[in-house]
């Protein structure tokens, strides 16, 4: 049965833009022993997608203010306790202790893509969440090193103990093309000053073009997991962010995974 499943997946891989048939598996192949781990990956991937969407629309709102680029610096985003996303623009002070916020954009309602932006003059000094996140981001960017294409960055809480996850992911450079791969995740201490763990998520960058041939319909995407036996947080982000919305099949050493368009992951045993 494993060989039949493999063949079905290869059909998807070879015809991702030509109306490929999705493989069908019975429930006997589902492995729910991975459910807690997969649900955690889904949760992080969904948070990455929300962060990216907030950064996009928050930036648009701030740009309408015609901001002073010398005050902009970088950006950070977070989902507040009231459920609304907030995006701030600024930079760390010379000592790296305070984050100086020059502009802020706040989501009007939960789930909304409209943000209200404001200029902060004088700049707001934050020595807490944003300062720690900014230091963690600098740690991750420095560890990742120089890049030869645009990259997006995300900083999210890693756990209740206050550590950070810093992600670097290639940004789209062409309409309708969604890059997958060439990304990394760093775990940084609560104060944002110490690198604790490095995780390479994917090696090469796949430029996924979601434009089907005339008369064809895209049914799913496909790629192999080389570095680990599990999907990555950014696999979920990729599915949630690209258009059109289609599932992604991932083949690892021991499993086939299906990432649904809502980010939920199902594991199927290969043997």
Residue ranges of model-derived segments:
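Bacterial N-terminal signal peptides
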Residues: 2-13
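Active-site-proximal loop/helix of nucleotide/amide-processing enzymes and allied scaffolds
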Residues: 21-117, 128-161, 206-271
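Short, solvent-exposed aromatic-acidic interface loops
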Residues: 93-94, 122, 198-207
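A short, surface-exposed beta-strand/turn
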Residues: 99-116, 178-196
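Hydrophobic, aromatic-enriched interface-forming segments
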Residues: 146-188
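Charge-rich, low-complexity terminal tails
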Residues: 176, 180-184, 188, 196-199, ...
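Gly/Pro-enriched, hydrophobic low-complexity segments
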Residues: 184-201, 214-217, 222
């Amino acid at each position: 049965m494993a060989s039949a499943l493999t063949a079905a997946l290869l059909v998807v891989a070879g015809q991702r833009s030509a109306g490929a048939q999705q493989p069908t598996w019975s429930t006997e192949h589902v492995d729910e022993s991975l459910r807690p781990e997969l649900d955690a990956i889904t949760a992080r991937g969904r948070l990455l997608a929300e962060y990216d969407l907030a950064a996009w629309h928050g930036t648009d709102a701030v740009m309408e203010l015609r901001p002073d680029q010398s005050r902009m610096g970088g950006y950070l985003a977070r989902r507040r306790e009231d459920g609304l996303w907030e995006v701030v623009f600024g930079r760390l002070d010379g000592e790296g202790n305070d984050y100086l916020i020059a502009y802020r954009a706040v989501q009007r309602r939960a789930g909304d893509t409209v943000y209200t932006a404001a200029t902060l003059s004088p700049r707001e000094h934050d020595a807490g969440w944003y300062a720690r996140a900014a230091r963690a981001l600098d740690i991750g960017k420095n560890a990742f090193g120089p890049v030869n294409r645009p990259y997006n960055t995300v900083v999210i809480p890693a756990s209740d103990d206050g550590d950070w996850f810093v992600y670097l992911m290639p940004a789209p450079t062409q309409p309708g093309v969604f890059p997958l791969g060439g990304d990394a995740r760093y775990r940084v201490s609560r104060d944002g000053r110490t690198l604790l763990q490095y995780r390479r998520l994917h090696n090469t960058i796949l430029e996924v073009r979601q434009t089907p041939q005339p008369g064809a319909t895209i049914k799913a995407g496909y790629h192999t997991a080389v570095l680990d036996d599990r999907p990555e947080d950014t696999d979920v982000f990729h599915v949630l962010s690209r258009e059109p919305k289609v599932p992604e099949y991932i083949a690892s050493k021991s499993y086939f995974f299906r990432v649904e368009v809502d980010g939920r992951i199902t594991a199927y045993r290969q043997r």
